[in-house]
Amino acid sequence: MAVTKARTFRELMNAPEILVVPSAYDALSAKVIQQAGFPAVHMTGSGTSASMLGLPDLGFTSVSEQAINLKNIVLTVDVPVIMDADAGYGNAMSVWRATREFERVGIVGYHLEDQVNPKRCGHLEGKRLISTEEMTGKIEAAVEAREDEDFTIIARTDARESFGLDEAIRRSREYVAAGADCIFLEAMLDVEEMKRVRDEIDAPLLANMVEGGKTPWLTTKELESIGYNLAIYPLSGWMAAASVLRKLFTELREAGTTQKFWDDMGLKMSFAELFEVFEYSKISELEARFVRDQD
């Protein structure tokens, strides 16, 4: 029997080496991540909200909007894809329905958080949490809904800021008991907190590396030495894209050309190389084989 992508992802997550999963916000960024050699892709919730809606990470995206972006990403890469499922889009039955929809789109897992819906970015102020009991109900609904037992359910808690680290650890243990396969404890403040979480939670751990966020910005080797199993980078791609685009189009408005921008940056990609990101040669070959003129 062939090994599924869900099984492959689980094996990577549980391997001795940390699994580094950059975050895509659309099909193009997912393609680039795969071509850079990473074994999996994470679909960022904040980047999806920004790229699809032009709105901040405050719970604006719906299940259907997430599924559209997911489908485009899953169809364009061959590696396993996981996603940010926010707070589950409602109650436990909303989680049940979302799990079915997302799994059938083709992802191998997601992370689900214990914030009140609509949620807020984990590194912003003003987060409100649901009860432990409500969250464990959501996790149990997700476990029931998944069709492949290897589909990975990552439980995120934002309790560190609201209630302290002790409560965040307590909740994390409850979430593991409810069936979570991995724990994502958001917004830890220093390395000592990260080490304590590793010591006190008997489950794989996800590290959320956010530029300018509250958690220390560590290298993958440093995270691995602490004992983290998985690292995601939800802002990196779309923050870089927004920064570069702003500089590029400011140059165009002020100078009337983009030439100086490319000269300063050093043109790293030719026109031909750009098209090969999308496998132009392969698609052209298929077109030549299959597209025939009508008589």
From Swiss-Prot:
GO terms for molecular function: carboxyvinyl-carboxyphosphonate phosphorylmutase activity; oxo-acid-lyase activity. Pathway: Secondary metabolite biosynthesis; bialaphos biosynthesis. The keyword Transferase applies. It is an enzyme of class 2 (transferase). Changing residue 68 to T: In strain: ATCC 21705. It comes from Streptomyces hygroscopicus. InterPro entries: CPEP_Pphonmut (IPR012697), ICL/PEPM (IPR039556), Isocitrate_lyase_ph_CS (IPR018523), Pyrv/PenolPyrv_kinase-like_dom (IPR015813), Pyrv_kinase-like_dom_sf (IPR040442). This is Carboxyvinyl-carboxyphosphonate phosphorylmutase. One of its GO terms (biological process) is antibiotic biosynthetic process. It comes from the Bacteria.
